[in-house]
């Protein structure tokens, strides 16, 4: 599946420059190159598997192109609908509110004030329009961002009235968020809102951006892994119960692309146990990536999806080669920071240091905070003192992060060197996974690094 994912990603990356030819020529060419690299020697028995996988790749390529090139649903029409608010997020100086309508899918409306909360049901009338076109001097594409999240267009609401609430995942998320705000200390509530329901506090998010650790607030493989580990502690290896807990948590937190990727990998692992087959970690990551691209090809342009897949590939390839877990965090940072620098302009250098121990720190802190929050909701005696101790733990982290940030106030920008470091490191570990000769790995690292720089230049 590594060859399939490599081909599809390359085709999507070149789509803006080559159009349909990126999926007609680039996808099969990259797929073929990776497949031949993975073969130690040519043998007749390889050809049936190669042709079958090539056919599958071409079908995936056709699916991606047909979705990406298709126009959005017809907009610029007046509609009267009922719907449920599924997401409210800050969007510059306004709020972006996603409404899931009963018959026309999802639309986003931009409001000056947050008049709605998640789970609110409304009856409204308004007009729809297409997304803003991409500006020449901007890398942000509004249409791709929202279409990756299943949103069909922009809605301008003229009149609305609230309807009685129904049970929905969005309503549950809002109730949990409100309870955390009422019963938890402020900082702990912000961290648990991010971990439990995927809601980010703007001030906390800005601080983590300064430290280079904002990925800890996004629900990702880190959070999904912690939840799965805790579930396994209580329920053992019961695949059905673990699967239910896994997907309830993912959808409760908003089903972010990074969380979906982690969920699919864990689900593949759990299913392999049922069928008595050994799950190969790199293959599981690639399978999850391909499934998500087929489900929503626009996810390729989501920075969270790209970082998630790259991180997971590095971790999987390293552990499959028997690497120490101590080397995992710096290796993941080397691979991902060029993408972050390209998207946001630069990354704090201190993040490379803090991320060596931040995941371990937060895995313990969030686990204890979650346990304390449950006890607090159940009104256990003295649970409020446990939450004060947890609040102190998060405050201590801020002091530590601020201290190191003051010592290392440097930033790293995107350039040819960072592009080569990121892609070269990823290629190195994947080359080791494919058991390529050192000279071949070095040659591929150079080609991939140069290609990555040319793609994003």
Language model segments and positions:
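N-terminal leader/targeting segments
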Residues: 1-71, 158, 261, 416-418, ...
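Internal transmembrane alpha-helical bundles of multi-pass membrane proteins
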Residues: 5-9, 257-446, 452-457
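Structural detector for short beta-strands of small beta-barrel domains
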Residues: 74-90
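Flexible glycine-rich surface loops and low-complexity tracts that mediate binding to linear polymers
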Residues: 81-82, 118-136
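Short aromatic-glycine-enriched beta-strand elements
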Residues: 90-98
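Beta-strand/loop nucleic-acid-binding surfaces
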Residues: 103-116
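Aromatic-rich juxtamembrane segments at the membrane interface
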Residues: 148-274
């Amino acid at each position: 599946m590594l060859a399939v994912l490599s081909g599809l990603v390359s085709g999507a990356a070149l789509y803006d420059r080559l159009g349909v030819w990126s999926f007609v020529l680039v996808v099969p060419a990259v797929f073929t190159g990776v497949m031949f690299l993975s073969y130690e020697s040519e043998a007749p028995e390889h050809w049936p598997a190669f042709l079958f996988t090539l056919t599958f790749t071409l079908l995936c390529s056709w699916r991606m192109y047909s979705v990406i090139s298709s126009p959005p649903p017809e907009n610029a029409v007046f509609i009267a609908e009922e719907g449920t608010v599924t997401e409210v997020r800050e969007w510059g100086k306004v709020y972006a509110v996603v409404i899931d309508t009963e018959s026309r899918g999802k639309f986003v409306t931009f409001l000056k004030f947050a008049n709605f909360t998640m789970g609110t049901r409304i009856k409204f009338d308004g007009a729809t329009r297409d997304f803003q076109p991409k500006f020449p001097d901007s890398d942000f594409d509004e249409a791709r961002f929202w279409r990756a999240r299943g949103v069909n267009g922009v809605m301008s609401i003229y009149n609305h009235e609230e309807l009685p609430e129904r049970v929905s995942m969005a309503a549950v998320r809002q109730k949990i968020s409100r309870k955390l705000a009422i019963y938890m200390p402020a900082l702990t509530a912000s961290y648990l809102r991010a971990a439990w329901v995927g809601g980010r506090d703007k001030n906390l998010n800005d601080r983590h951006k300064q430290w280079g650790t904002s990925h800890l607030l996004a629900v990702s493989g880190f959070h999904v892994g912690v939840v799965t580990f805790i579930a396994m502690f209580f329920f053992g290896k019961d695949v059905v119960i673990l699967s239910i807990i896994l997907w309830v948590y993912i959808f409760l937190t908003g089903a972010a692309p990074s969380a979906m990727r982690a969920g699919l990998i864990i689900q593949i692992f759990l299913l392999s146990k049922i069928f008595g087959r050994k799950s190969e970690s790199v293959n599981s990551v690639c399978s999850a990536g391909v499934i998500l691209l087929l489900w929503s090809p626009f996810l390729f342009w989501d920075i969270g999806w790209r970082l998630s897949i790259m991180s997971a590939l590095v971790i999987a390839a390293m552990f499959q080669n028997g690497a120490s877990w101590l080397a995992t965090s710096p290796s993941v940072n080397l691979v991902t920071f060029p993408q972050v620098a390209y998207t946001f302009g630069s990354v704090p250098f201190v993040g490379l240091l803090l991320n060596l121990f931040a995941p371990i720190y937060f895995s313990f802190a969030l686990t204890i905070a979650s346990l304390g929050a449950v006890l607090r909701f159940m009104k256990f005696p003295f649970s409020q003192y446990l939450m004060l101790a947890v609040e102190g733990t998060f405050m201590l982290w801020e002091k530590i992060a601020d201290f190191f940030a003051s010592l290392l106030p440097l930033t790293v920008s995107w350039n040819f060197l960072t592009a080569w470091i990121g892609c070269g490191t990823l290629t190195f570990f994947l080359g080791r996974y494919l058991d390529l000769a050192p000279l071949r790995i070095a040659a591929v690292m150079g080609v991939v690094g140069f290609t990555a720089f040319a793609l994003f230049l």
